[in-house]
Amino acid sequence: LLFPFISFSQDSLNMSLLGYVDYPNTNGIDIWGWVDSSGNEFAIVGLRDGVSVVDVTDPSNPDEKFFIADIYSVWRDIKTWNNYAYVTTESDTGILIIDLNDMTGSTYWHVKDFISYNLNDTLHIEAAHNLFIYENGYAYIFGASNPPGYAAPPNGAIILDLNASSINPTYVGNWNSHYIHDGMVRNDTLWAACVYYGSAFFIDVSD
């Protein structure tokens, strides 16, 4: 278990603390897990000032492999596909794509422009609230936004295809009837929490 701070003031129910990594000068925002081809387990931790990747194969001895400093933000969301981590933030850095094959932390990209599947359009994204990646290699970007001077992107769901290129995803479509705060996909259905509308929507994404 990884915590931005540790408190031992009360007992846990059926749980024992095995180890932790302390981040004394920042705060934790999000966490995601990833397993490499050898079965080693990693925690990918979103922090206010970047992203930390920690080897937790031995949970009693977690080992931070690298840290990527990034623009300060109170929000990051992380998902993985194959050997890459994808990080959204509400600051204007695009989507951070990290190559997890390189445990030095030196191989990553901030991607802001996504070419459509028919090559007729390019979608520009500076910030996004959340993302979800389904097992078929399609990423769903939720709550995207751009600063003044850029065209507003769809702030519902933006769909990216990661299959052809993990570091250069293709823009394949969007649903933009309402702002989506969070969502998930199972089979051909997107389950979307449209917080400002006060409703959940179930959207057919089969095509």
Which sequence ranges carry the predicted segments?
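Sec-dependent N-terminal signal peptides
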Residues: 1-9
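Feature marking well-ordered beta-strand scaffolds used for ligand recognition
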Residues: 9-207
